[in-house]
């Protein structure tokens, strides 16, 4: 469910915190995807058009989620997006009341759905079908099996997938959380992406936590209080309190305990919810856990064709596409570097910003059951032209305080001209990215001192990739529309070659 009414409230109160982007903009990113939310969407969207029933195999087992997973993963990989699917485990005890209410509503919806079908009321049946769906353990198991056969990372949450997704982002193992549940923000997920797994052609909605905090003038602790008061899965709501009232109360009292007691609620219950948001139970993972694995064509064929009655021709085409994606080489996408200035801690003061959670902030299980394996990635190219890139440079010696800004066209050091020449080769190549492959360009220059590059790309973002090892040398900042400074790798006092495989413009 997430936080009740949060998105409409933010759309009105802090519209700058919410933006739309296309799937292509996420090329090269790694997404921690809430698997249960994704499977739920697939199961609702892919149904028999006559009776709105889920697609099934010869054993009567649902396969709608498998169709959806295949199609969406294929699209994500096509754009060079690395999906990391995160699966729920046993929910916390705090959520039992919410789950009981959902179970009751689902049973009521099933009764109404059957009645609508028997009466031939397809319009009502279509509206009700989403409320009857439950993602089962068997569906989760079959989804995990498919993903592993595709070489896609599978992460097991200790409890809530949303908390585990936020953990992966705060540990910099993934760049964004993809979920429909807004409580990922309350768990500390830096960016929330919605509609990533939607089957419809919806624009992806990005919610920026830092902009939310800035716009509401909350520190992270106050934001958690506000969201709990709006309504969450872990405690009851206070009568007559929605987002607008919750906002006013937090502004006035700045204490969850004071607010709850003022409204006649049970503070112990609210405190438990807050403690869980601030210190959820998660499994600990490392970089190997989120690496892409190898594709198993034989295993996929057996699972999809023999076990689930998919068309052999369809499966062969699907595997062919996966292998094609694998043979392409990824250029590390940089939306995360361009847009994600990670905070350092959960703040008590507004100036400190929201939290980038460390391991200590979570109740961590250090022995999760699944780990990742080898990585493969795909190319992503932009067709925007590279004209107008301006380059300035600074030179530094080992004393970083001794920095000389090179501003003139001609200069005693000669550094400006050599670096400008390096980028000038790209200025007029407006069709550079229309071809699949191109020769990397390089410029040899004297490295008597260490160089730093600073690019001004105006309304565009740029990234430079080192030809030799695909190391990101520098990236632009999409908010300030300025590049961060990227240091040239070669050691000072040597002559070296600075190779670029690509300049990406976003």
From Swiss-Prot:
Pfam families: XPG_I (PF00867), XPG_N (PF00752)
Posttranslational modification: Phosphorylated. Phosphorylation upon DNA damage induces relocalization to the nuclear plasma.
Family: Belongs to the XPG/RAD2 endonuclease family. FEN1 subfamily.
Region (Interaction with PCNA): 330-338
Organism: Theileria annulata
Amino-acid positions noted as binding Mg(2+) 1 in the UniProt annotation, renumbered to this chain: 34, 88, 160, 162
UniProt-listed Enzyme Commission number(s): 3.1.-.-
One annotated GO biological process: DNA replication, removal of RNA primer
Group of enzyme by EC: hydrolase
Protein role: Structure-specific nuclease with 5'-flap endonuclease and 5'-3' exonuclease activities involved in DNA replication and repair. During DNA replication, cleaves the 5'-overhanging flap structure that is generated by displacement synthesis when DNA polymerase encounters the 5'-end of a downstream Okazaki fragment. It enters the flap from the 5'-end and then tracks to cleave the flap base, leaving a nick for ligation. Also involved in the long patch base excision repair (LP-BER) pathway, by cleaving within the apurinic/apyrimidinic (AP) site-terminated flap.
GO molecular function: 5'-3' exonuclease activity; 5'-flap endonuclease activity; DNA binding; magnesium ion binding
Binding site for Mg(2+) 2: 181, 183, 233
Localization of this protein: Nucleus, Nucleolus; Nucleus, Nucleoplasm; Mitochondrion
Protein name as annotated: Flap endonuclease 1
Gene3D superfamilies: 5' to 3' exonuclease, C-terminal subdomain, 5'-nuclease
Region (N-domain) residue spans: 1-106
Composition bias type Basic and acidic residues, residue spans: 348-363
Binding of DNA, residues: 47, 72, 160, 231, 233
SUPFAM superfamilies reported for this sequence: 5' to 3' exonuclease, C-terminal subdomain, PIN domain-like
Ranges of compositional bias, category Polar residues: 338-347, 364-381
């Amino acid at each position: 469910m997430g936080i009740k009414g949060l998105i409409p409230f933010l759309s009105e109160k802090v519209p700058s915190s919410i933006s739309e982007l296309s799937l292509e903009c996420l090329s090269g990113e790694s997404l921690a995807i809430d698997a249960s939310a994704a499977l739920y969407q697939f199961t609702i969207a892919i149904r028999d058009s006559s009776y709105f029933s889920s697609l099934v195999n010869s054993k009567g087992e649902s396969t709608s989620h498998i169709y959806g997973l295949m199609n969406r993963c294929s699209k994500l990989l096509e754009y060079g997006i690395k999906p990391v699917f995160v699966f729920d485990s046993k929910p916390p005890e705090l959520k039992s009341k919410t789950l009981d209410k959902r179970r009751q509503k689902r049973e009521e919806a099933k009764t109404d759905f059957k009645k609508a079908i028997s009466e031939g009321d397809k319009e009502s049946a279509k509206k009700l079908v989403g409320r009857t769906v439950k993602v089962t353990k068997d569906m989760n198991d079959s989804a995990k099996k498919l993903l592993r056969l595709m070489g896609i990372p599978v992460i097991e949450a200790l409890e809530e997938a949303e908390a585990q997704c936020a953990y992966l982002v705060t540990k910099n193992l993934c760049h964004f959380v993809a979920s429909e549940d807004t409580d990922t923000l309350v768990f500390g997920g830096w960016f929330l992406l919605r509609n990533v797994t939607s089957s419809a052609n919806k624009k992806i909605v990005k919610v920026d936590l830092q902009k939310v905090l800035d716009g509401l003038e909350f520190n992270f602790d106050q934001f958690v209080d506000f969201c709990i008061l709006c309504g969450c899965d872990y405690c009851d709501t206070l009568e007559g309190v929605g987002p607008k009232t919750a906002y006013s109360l937090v502004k006035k009292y700045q204490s969850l305990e004071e607010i709850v007691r003022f409204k006649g609620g049970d503070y112990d219950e609210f405190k438990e919810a807050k403690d869980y948001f601030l210190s959820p139970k998660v499994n600990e993972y490392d970089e190997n856990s989120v690496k892409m694995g190898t594709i198993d064509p034989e295993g996929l064929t057996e699972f999809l064709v023999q076990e689930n009655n998919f068309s052999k021709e369809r499966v062969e085409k699907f595997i062919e596409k996966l292998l094609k994606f694998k043979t392409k080489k990824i250029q590390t996408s940089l939306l995360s570097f361009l847009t994600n200035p990670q905070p350092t801690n959960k703040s008590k003061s507004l100036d400190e910003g929201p939290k980038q959670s460390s391991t200590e902030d979570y109740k961590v299980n250090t022995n999760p059951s699944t780990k990742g394996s080898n990585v493969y990635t795909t190319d992503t190219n932009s067709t925007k032209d590279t004209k107008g890139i301006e380059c300035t440079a600074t030179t530094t010696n080992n004393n970083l305080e001794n920095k000389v800004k090179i501003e003139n066209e001609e200069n005693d050091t000669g550094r400006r001209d050599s670096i400008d020449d390096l980028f000038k080769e790209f200025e007029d190549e407006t069709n550079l990215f229309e071809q699949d492959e191109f020769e990397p360009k390089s410029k040899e220059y004297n490295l008597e001192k260490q160089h730093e590059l600073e690019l001004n790309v105006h309304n565009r973002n740029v990234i430079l990739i080192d030809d030799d090892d695909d190391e990101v040398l520098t990236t632009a900042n999409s908010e300030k529309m300025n590049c961060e400074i990227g240091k040239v790798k070669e050691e000072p006092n040597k002559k070296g070659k600075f190779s670029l495989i690509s300049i990406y413009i976003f």
